[in-house]
């Protein structure tokens, strides 16, 4: 709803200026009315309760009370006493809690069997109760709500638009409509409850009543949490003892409202304690500025002033009350008309003075005679006195006088004492107003207020005398004289001066002593002297008098209890007098002292532990305990041993740290509604940061192991990269440990709150007791009984010993051991951990070493001999030492969880418990292996005794091992099949190895290492790819060279033996058959082995080839991806760089082109001269056509061209200006020019490069502008230089008197110049708002000029344009004259140091726009000649303007002819061509030279000459004296209207557009005139007339006439800006705020803050 409200307000503000504003306010009022009635608050809940319990009559009464409360709230806006009485925060704060407590107490005891009776008539006793409850709760609704922003916002809106009658009426209808809708909804709810409820309706009423009482109690508790009443707090007793002479503090009843209950200076309720500094200076501010708002007269109207004195406001109100001055009705005559008349008269006088000065300028008066001068004090010889003794200057510009330290020199008496003596004498004279006020005061018997001229009472006189003595008896001088003296403005010394001389302090002491002597006479001291005291002294004096009267009241009360004859009337009179004391002295300043807390609070620099008497809360601790250093075997604490303190701070947000105990708490802000119970408060601003995931940071050890060369890897690379996270090596456990630590801390922080500790602590303790005393004993008993049943020896002793070693240590939440028998303190709030030392693990049997140790312990040593005893002892000690060393090597411990599991650390990973049946299964496997080994051994024995076993020794048991086990080792280092022999033959066959050459004859289960080497071609790929299949292992079968020879020889020998045995086979037929059968079986086994070998090779080869192929693909893909990313990045960087470079070049080029095209077309077109008969060639010359084309026209044609499916040459020629071309077929000729310069070779105009444009520009000599034209391209810079010139002239004094000594002036000349600069800056700052036409049109002059002046300037411009074209009839040789202009001697390096006639044309090749090497070299060659030559330069000037115009035409024609004849030397044109030509023509003039020219010869200044520098330094001071006698020749076509055109003594009429009219006035008069013209003293009816009349008395012109005259070149915005005066701008008064309104906050816009809301006009 609030969002809808803001949108509606924005719509109203936007639609405010339109005529339909009343309709929008009506809609907004209706919306506001519904919002004020419909939200469910406490009053609405009470209305629902009244309808449900009291019927329709009770509900109607509740609604009436709610409407009445809303009406009172709205009336409080119009009538402030209602707001003070009912709605003021101080009063309503005290009323809320008692009323809610009373209401809750009244509704809580209603029984279920006594439901409330409905209200049937208005005579019922419940009528008044329901109405008052609804009325009061509607008033308290904005306070009781948990978040009253909505209700207060509505009140703010109605306060904003309370002056709109349409809004008030519509909001009233909105309230009524909202309440009617609310009543109908309640009735519908009642019907639904009666119809749908299955419970008895009276019982429902009782339940509703009980629920409502609960709601009231909850809201009351919420209110207590929000704003507790600061009545009963913990006092902080200060250690200082009160002095006997100290004034007794006023009692509680003497304090005014609301300070009596809500005192912001309540020293015993600080929020945070800030300790004083080492020097006793507290960082807390001692006082702050406090604004006092009051009405005052400003600009002829009543306005709000925030710098008014409370004393003056109080005196004005009391004087109006006692003199019965009635309020002046709005219909009567305005009391400020006299002030308006005076200010209007001053404004008219100032305007008339300025008008007269302007008219004098129009009448050909010199500006030096018209300009206003400052009056200065001088003697009869016109010697101006120094500024220190000039009374016409303010004291800020006089400087400060350095008082001599010599005791023989005495200063004169300050002028302030003389002024005060005069003021005292004037006050003694008769004053008619004073007598009249005194008579009226005596007639009305108003003795409560003392008049200023009345003498002091005896008590007041004694107090004043006491203060004077205290000031005069000070031993040490104070640096702040305003604290010493009683008067506000005694001396000129400011507050920031740190030292003061003894003589000045002696003067002050003499003055205070004189004041003390004058106070001895009772008649000379009155209340006016008290008012002249400083603010602090006045306040101290008033409090002193107040305490004196309070002492009198206390003495009277003592007599009252002692004397029973005192009347009640006297008592009431004294009480009234006591409470009226503070109304008599209300003289205060606008500075409010800040509360200062006591510095005796017990506070320490660090968070001290174990101290309970501190006055400041320290950081919240948790798990605080004492850890003892000496612990026995059972970890029992010995109280006599030393201990150390272990402290750990809470991880939760600690909002009460550094708070003074007993101080008021602040609410937790920036908390979301759904996170009100969260552990750590986070503002919504930081929620988005919490949602961002933190990237995983791989440790350095792990990152070094991961192969960064191939990121996209197959299974082999993934195995190398990820297996280290889960491997068992020491280096590879680092990452897993760090990752687990992070997760463990996260879980611990999530469970670190009180409710979780309650739910976790109890199950943890129960699990500890169950494990120690239930589970483990049951397992021990079951195990030993099972051993007995299995006819094994029970192990009762071993098991119970291990059970007794298991110790459960109670620890803090972070795992710090505390105690074995006791739980930590506050374990249910701060958490608990249980650490198990030597945890018990149930085993089926114990270790053999333990058994040997126990067996040896049970042996009797006496039964052995000496040798046996030594051997037995050594055996016993060795076994025991080995066991104890293994036991002490590492203490086994774990932490218990609530599920009974064990972890290695709190909230860590679950430890893997040893499996009980694992030793049993292992033992069974060993037995099975042993049985199989015996069977194999028996088979071997049987085979040895076989009859044919001795003849056929091919596979003897000594050579061929028995096949006992074939397994595949799947470890990470072995990927081949490995043969594992029997335990018995393991040592014999460890060195048995084979070769790949006789692999066909090998039995099953043996695979050589060479079988892994697939081929020479793939071996390198395998090693590069994974490196797994080529790794050597200790378990691989590797053949030996000697063994290979022996086995081969033995094999062939056995084969030969078998062939020899064929002869004998006939004798033994059965043996031959068996041998053949064995050979067949062997061959069959060989084929199987060969097949398995091939299949294994194929599988390995396939896998390796796949891995190698995928590795190559991934490596190539990764490389290409990196190349692609790198290429894109480089491409993007180059693209952005080129964009910026091209944009800068284009912008720079277009800016220069636009300036040349729009502002300086006059100078560009001067050289465009077309000859008719003479010098005209029938053939078109390309360079001649180029010179006839302007650069601006070229760029303009390119911009206007359309490049889509068309040739830009046609569009270029379409928009071309035909005026610049000669003859016919200009398109063809222009095409030839463009083709020669390489412009047509480009496909599109936007593809033209910089070189193309440079080639084009090199053909245009008009693009090389001289320096006097470039100075006008940047007029703002030129104007700034002129402004600097004026600053330099104003900074130096007008006259320097050497006869008067200046030893007492401590201000240096540099400081005085800085002050004058600041003054000039302020004047320009205020006037800059009038310089509004900085970018005005060139073709038209300022609109506020007269018609006659406009005509003169238009004619002049027309003449200039006519000079651009030359007719053939005017080319008469008799009219050939030359013009010589030597301008801009500020740049002597651009001129040639020789005797020539200087001309503008000579300067053109020296400052070309395109910097060429030839010009640079030419300049370097002439540099030495220019520095050494100091000859005179002759300059001539024509006496006739017409002669100059004709000579200029002919000179341009001659110059054009020279250019055509010397095309190759066009760029670097020699300077002597035109000089020689002019000398030739000059020689033809003969005797007419003297009549035509004026000699203006001068010498070039030396660059390095001390005399010249000295002259320039001294002449600067002379410029200020003759500042109006030098002419600053500026261009007519400057951008700004205000210009400085200072006329020479020749006397010539100047226009007001060439200079600043306000320069003829002094800065002080300028500002006065501007401020007097700003206020609208006569209203808005004469505003149009003022605008038509103009500012400086110029001829009036209406808006219509101005628009008609300037229709083509100016728009309406320019017209409005040029007539806009500072009275319609806020910036001008804002800039003058600090100087005219005396604000002290340093902000220029302080006055603008008074208007808090924008106004909406009907």
From Swiss-Prot:
Q: Which UniProt keywords apply?
A: Chloroplast, Membrane, Plastid, Plastid inner membrane, Protein transport, Transmembrane, Transmembrane helix, Transport
* InterPro entries for this protein: TIC214
Membrane topology field: Multi-pass membrane protein
Xref: Pfam families: Ycf1
Tell me how this protein assembles. Part of the Tic complex.
Q: What does this protein do?
A: Involved in protein precursor import into chloroplasts. May be part of an intermediate translocation complex acting as a protein-conducting channel at the inner envelope.
What's the protein called, per UniProt?
Answer: Protein TIC 214
**Origin species:** Huperzia lucidula (Shining clubmoss)
């Amino acid at each position: 709803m609030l969002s809808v409200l803001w949108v509606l307000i924005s719509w109203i503000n936007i639609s405010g200026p339109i005529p339909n504003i009343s309709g929008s306010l009506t809609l907004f009022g209706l919306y506001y009315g519904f919002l004020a009635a419909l939200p469910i608050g406490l009053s609405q809940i009470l209305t629902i309760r009244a309808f449900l319990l009291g019927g329709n009559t009770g509900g109607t009464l509740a609604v009436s009370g709610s409407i009445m409360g809303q009406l009172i709230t709205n009336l409080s806006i119009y009538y402030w006493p209602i707001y003070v009485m009912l709605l003021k925060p101080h009063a309503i704060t005290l009323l809320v809690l008692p009323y809610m407590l009373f209401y809750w107490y009244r509704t809580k005891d209603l029984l279920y069997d006594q439901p409330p009776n409905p209200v049937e008539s208005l005579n019922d006793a419940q009528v008044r109760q329901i109405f008052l409850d609804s009325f009061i709760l509607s008033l308290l609704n904005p306070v009781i709500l948990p978040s009253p922003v909505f209700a207060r916002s509505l009140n703010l809106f109605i306060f904003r638009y309370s002056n709109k009658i349409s809004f008030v009426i519509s909001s009233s209808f909105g309230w009524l409509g909202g309440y009617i809708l609310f009543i109908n909804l309640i009735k519908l709810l009642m019907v639904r409850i009666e119809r749908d409820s299955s419970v008895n309706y009276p019982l429902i009423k009782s339940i509703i009543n009980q629920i409502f009482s609960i709601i009231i109690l909850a809201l009351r508790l919420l209110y207590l949490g929000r704003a507790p009443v600061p009545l009963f707090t913990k006092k902080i007793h200060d250690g200082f003892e009160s002095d006997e002479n100290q004034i007794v503090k006023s009692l509680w009843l003497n304090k005014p409202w609301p300070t009596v209950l809500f005192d912001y200076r309540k020293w015993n309720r600080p929020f945070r304690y800030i300790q004083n500094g080492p020097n006793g200076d507290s960082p807390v501010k001692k006082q702050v500025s406090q604004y006092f708002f009051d009405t005052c007269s400003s600009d002829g109207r009543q306005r709000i002033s925030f710098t008014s004195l409370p004393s003056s406001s109080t005196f004005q109100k009391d004087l109006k009350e006692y003199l019965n001055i009635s309020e002046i009705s709005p219909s009567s005559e305005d009391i400020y008309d006299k002030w308006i008349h005076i200010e209007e008269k001053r404004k008219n006088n100032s305007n008339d003075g300025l008008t007269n000065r302007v008219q004098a300028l129009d009448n050909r008066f010199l500006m030096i005679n018209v300009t206003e001068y400052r009056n200065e004090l001088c003697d009869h010889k016109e010697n101006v006195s120094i500024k220190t003794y000039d009374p016409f200057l303010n004291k800020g510009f006089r400087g400060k006088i350095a008082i001599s330290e010599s005791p023989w020199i005495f200063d004169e008496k300050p002028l302030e004492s003389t002024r005060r003596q005069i003021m005292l004498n004037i006050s003694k004279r008769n004053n008619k107003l004073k007598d009249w006020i005194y008579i009226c005061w005596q007639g009305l018997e108003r003795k409560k207020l003392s008049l200023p001229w009345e003498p002091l009472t005896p008590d007041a006189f004694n107090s004043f005398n006491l203060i004077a003595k205290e000031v005069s008896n000070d031993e040490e001088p104070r640096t702040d004289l305003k604290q010493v003296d009683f008067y506000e403005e005694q001396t000129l010394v400011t507050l920031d001066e740190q030292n003061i001389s003894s003589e000045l302090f002696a003067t002050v002491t003499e003055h205070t002593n004189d004041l003390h002597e004058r106070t001895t006479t009772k008649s000379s001291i009155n209340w006016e002297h008290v008012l002249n005291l400083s603010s602090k002294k006045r306040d101290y004096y008033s409090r002193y008098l107040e305490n004196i009267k309070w002492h009198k009241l206390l003495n009277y009360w003592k007599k009252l209890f002692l004397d029973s004859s005192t009347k009640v009337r006297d008592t009431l009179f004294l009480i009234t007098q006591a409470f009226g004391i503070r109304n008599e002295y209300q003289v205060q300043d606008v500075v409010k002292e800040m509360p200062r807390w006591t510095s005796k609070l017990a506070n320490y620099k660090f968070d001290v532990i174990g101290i309970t008497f501190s006055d400041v809360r320290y950081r919240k601790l948790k798990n605080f305990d004492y850890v003892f250093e000496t612990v026995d075997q059972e970890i029992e604490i010995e109280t006599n041993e030393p201990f150390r303190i272990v402290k750990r701070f809470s991880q939760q947000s600690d909002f009460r740290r550094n708070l003074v105990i007993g101080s008021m708490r602040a609410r937790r802000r920036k908390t979301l509604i759904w996170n009100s119970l969260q552990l750590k408060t986070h503002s919504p601003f930081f929620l988005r940061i919490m949602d961002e995931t933190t990237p995983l940071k791989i440790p350095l050890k792990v990152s070094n192991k991961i192969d960064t060369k191939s990121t996209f890897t197959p299974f082999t690379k993934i195995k190398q990269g990820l297996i280290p996270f889960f491997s068992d090596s020491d280096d590879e456990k680092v990452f897993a440990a760090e990752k687990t630590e992070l997760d463990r801390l996260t879980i611990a922080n999530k469970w670190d709150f009180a409710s979780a500790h309650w739910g976790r602590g109890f199950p943890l303790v129960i699990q500890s007791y169950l494990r120690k005393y239930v589970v483990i004993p049951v397992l021990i008993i079951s195990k030993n009984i099972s051993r007995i049943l299995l006819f094994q020896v029970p192990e009762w002793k071993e098991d119970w010993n291990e059970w007794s070693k298991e110790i459960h240590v109670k620890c803090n939440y972070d795992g710090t051991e505390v105690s074995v028998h006791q739980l930590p303190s506050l374990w249910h709030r701060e958490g608990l951990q249980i650490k198990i030392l030597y945890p018990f693990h149930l085993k089926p049997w114990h270790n053999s070493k333990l058994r040997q140790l126990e067996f040896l312990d049970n042996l009797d040593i006496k039964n052995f001999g000496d040798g046996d005893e030594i051997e037995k002892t050594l055996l016993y000690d060795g076994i025991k030492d080995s066991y104890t060393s293994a036991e002490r090597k590492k203490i086994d411990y774990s932490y218990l969880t609530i599920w009974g599991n064990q972890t290695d650390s709190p909230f860590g990973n679950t430890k893997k418990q040893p499996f009980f049946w694992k030793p049993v299964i292992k033992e069974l496997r060993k037995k099975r292996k042993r049985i199989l080994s015996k069977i194999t051994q028996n088979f071997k024995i049987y085979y040895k005794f076989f009859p044919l076993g001795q003849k056929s020794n091919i596979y003897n048991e000594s050579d061929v091992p028995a096949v006992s086990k074939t397994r595949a080792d799947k470890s990470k280092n072995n990927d081949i099949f490995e043969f594992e022999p029997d335990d018995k033959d393991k040592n014999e066959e460890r060195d048995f190895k084979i070769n790949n050459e006789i692999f066909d004859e090998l039995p099953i289960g043996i695979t050589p290492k060479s079988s892994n080497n697939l081929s020479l071609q793939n071996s390198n790929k395998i090693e590069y790819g994974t490196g797994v299949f080529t790794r050597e292992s200790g378990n691989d079968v590797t053949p030996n060279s000697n063994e290979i020879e022996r086995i081969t020889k033995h094999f062939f020998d056995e084969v030969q033996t078998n062939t020899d045995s064929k002869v004998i086979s006939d004798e033994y037929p059965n043996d031959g058959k068996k041998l053949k059968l064995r050979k067949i079986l062997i061959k069959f086994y060989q084929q199987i082995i060969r097949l398995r070998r091939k299949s294994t090779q194929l599988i390995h080869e396939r896998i390796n080839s796949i891995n190698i192929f995928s590795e190559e693909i991934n490596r190539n893909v990764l490389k290409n991806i990196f190349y692609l990313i790198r290429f894109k990045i480089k491409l993007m960087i180059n693209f952005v760089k080129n964009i910026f470079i091209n944009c800068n070049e284009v912008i720079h080029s277009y800016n220069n082109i636009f300036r040349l095209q729009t502002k300086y077309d006059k100078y560009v077109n001067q050289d465009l001269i077309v000859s008719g008969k003479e010098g005209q060639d029938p053939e078109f010359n390309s360079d001649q056509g180029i010179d006839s084309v302007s650069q601006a026209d070229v760029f303009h044609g390119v911009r206007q061209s359309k490049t889509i499916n068309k040739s830009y040459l046609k569009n270029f020629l379409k928009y071309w200006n035909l005026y610049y071309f000669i003859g016919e077929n200009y398109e063809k000729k222009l095409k030839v020019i463009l083709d020669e310069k390489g412009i047509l070779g480009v496909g599109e105009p936007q593809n033209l490069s910089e070189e193309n444009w440079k080639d084009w520009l090199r053909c245009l000599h008009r693009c090389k502008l001289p320096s006097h034209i470039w100075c006008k391209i940047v007029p703002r810079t030129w104007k700034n230089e002129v402004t600097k010139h004026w600053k330099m002239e104003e900074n130096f004094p007008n006259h320097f008197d050497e006869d008067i000594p200046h030893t007492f002036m401590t201000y240096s000349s540099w400081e005085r110049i800085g002050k004058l600069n600041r003054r000039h800056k302020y004047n320009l700052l205020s006037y800059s708002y009038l310089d509004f036409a900085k970018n005005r049109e060139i073709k038209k002059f300022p609109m506020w000029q007269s018609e006659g002046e406009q005509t003169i300037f238009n004619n002049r411009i027309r003449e200039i344009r006519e000079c651009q074209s030359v007719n053939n009839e005017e080319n008469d040789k008799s009219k050939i004259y030359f013009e010589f202009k030597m301008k801009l001697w500020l740049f002597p390096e651009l001129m040639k140091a020789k005797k020539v006639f200087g001309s503008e044309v000579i300067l053109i090749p020296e400052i070309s726009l395109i910097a060429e090497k030839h010009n640079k070299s030419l300049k370097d060659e002439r540099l030495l000649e220019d520095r050494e030559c100091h000859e005179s330069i002759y300059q001539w000037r024509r006496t006739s303007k017409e002669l100059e115009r004709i000579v200029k035409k002919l000179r341009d024609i001659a110059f054009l002819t020279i250019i055509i004849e010397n095309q190759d030397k066009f760029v670097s044109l020699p300077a002597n061509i035109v000089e020689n030509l002019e000398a030739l023509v000059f020689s033809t003039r003969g005797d007419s030279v003297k009549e035509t020219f004026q000699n203006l010869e001068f010498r070039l200044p030396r660059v390095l000459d001390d005399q010249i520098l000295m002259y320039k330094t001294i002449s600067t001071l002379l410029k200020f004296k003759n500042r109006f006698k030098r002419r600053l020749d500026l261009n007519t076509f400057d951008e700004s209207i205000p210009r400085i055109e200072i006329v020479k003594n020749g006397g010539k009429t100047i226009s007001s557009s060439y200079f600043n009219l306000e320069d003829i006035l002094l800065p002080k008069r300028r500002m006065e005139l501007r401020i007097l013209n700003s206020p609208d003293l006569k209203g808005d009816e004469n505003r149009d007339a003022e605008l038509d009349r103009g500012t400086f008395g110029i001829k009036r012109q209406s808006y219509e006439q101005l628009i008609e005259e300037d229709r083509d070149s100016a728009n309406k915005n320019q017209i409005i800006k040029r007539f806009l005066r500072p009275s319609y701008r806020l910036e001008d008064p804002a800039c003058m705020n600090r100087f005219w309104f005396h604000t002290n906050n340093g902000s220029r816009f302080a006055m603008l803050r008074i208007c808090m809301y924008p106004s909406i006009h009907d």
